[in-house]
């Protein structure tokens, strides 16, 4: 699966639903501006991330997820979860040669952590 992050202009224009339909994507949560699709989407209006793993959000789950993936360089994105990414980064075992994106959000109302790879 893939997570799609719309450009800020799309969000401000409230065209997320239209963009989702155009690309065969669906909203991850009715109140969050992230979409999901079964295949990668190439659009200048979207940033696409390939999902590597998804777990319920907790510090314990995120720490285990990052440690197992041997991630040394981590981009943290968040929507709908009240957390300070810089503070979270300081608690994670960032050891390894891999790089990834951690997306913290709500999926159908549930706090979720998604480890993903940003696509070009």
Where would I find each of the regions flagged by the language model?
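SAM-dependent transferase fold signal centered on methyltransferase-like domains
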Residues: 1-120
């Amino acid at each position: 699966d893939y997570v799609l992050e719309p450009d800020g202009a799309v969000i401000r224009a409230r065209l997320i639903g239209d963009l989702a339909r155009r690309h065969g994507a669906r909203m991850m949560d009715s109140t969050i501006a992230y979409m999901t699709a079964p295949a990668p989407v190439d659009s200048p209006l979207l940033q696409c991330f390939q999902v590597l793993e998804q777990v319920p959000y907790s510090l314990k789950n995120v720490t285990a997820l990052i440690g197992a993936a041997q991630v040394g360089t981590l981009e943290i994105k968040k929507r709908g979860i009240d957390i300070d990414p810089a503070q979270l980064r300081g608690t994670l075992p960032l050891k390894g040669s891999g790089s990834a994106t951690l997306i913290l959000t709500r999926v159908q109302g549930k706090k979720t952590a998604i480890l993903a790879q940003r696509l070009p």
